[in-house]
Amino acid sequence: GLLSVLGSVAKHVLPHVVPVIAEHL
């Protein structure tokens, strides 16, 4: 379903987003 798609997208996106956010913190 839509949630599983969002979940798989999040798994690909989060590893790239988290380090960027951490740099600004």
UniProtKB/Swiss-Prot annotation:
GO terms under cellular component: extracellular region
Primary location group: secreted
Subcellular location: Secreted
Modified residues annotated as Leucine amide in this record: L25
Post-translational modification: The major product is Caerin-1.1; in addition, different peptides are produced that are missing some amino acid residues at the N-terminus. Caerin-1.1.1 is inactive.
Superkingdom of the source species: Eukaryota
Keyword Secreted tagged: yes
UniProt similarity note: Belongs to the frog skin active peptide (FSAP) family. Caerin subfamily.
Protein name: Caerin-1.1
Organism: Ranoidea splendida (Magnificent tree frog)
Upper lineage: Eukaryota, Metazoa, Chordata, Craniata, Vertebrata
